[in-house]
């Protein structure tokens, strides 16, 4: 099976208001704009016991094993949404990490949107938003 290719665009916060804070996430209001800078995500189903997630590119060095993409798949597994499907994901990073451009968040959001729109997973928009909020404050901002 060949890889599918997804562009995961950076986002720019034009205005940001933190409404409330918790230990892990902030409740925010934001005005965003997507920019032409993007990471490239390659994804395909595989026969494996686990998902294979890898990052490469100039801005991949500091990405650890616990990241927004691995967190997304952990949530999908725990909610039994994937139904034992496994994926290989290769992400070429062009968006600098820790730069406020939402690179990691947008990677997870792009994958979630892809899986839903291609009907690889059966999920309603309301559930997608709940999952997005578990991963990051700014994920629910994306156009799921």
Regions found by a protein language model. Name each.
Residues 101-103:
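Flexible lysine-rich "adenylation lid" loop at the C-terminal edge of ANL adenylation domains
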Residues 105-119:
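Short, small-residue alpha-helix embedded
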Residues 142-144:
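Conserved small/polar residues in nucleotide/adenosyl-binding loops
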Residues 1-99, 116-123:
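ATP-binding N-lobe of GHMP and related small-molecule kinases
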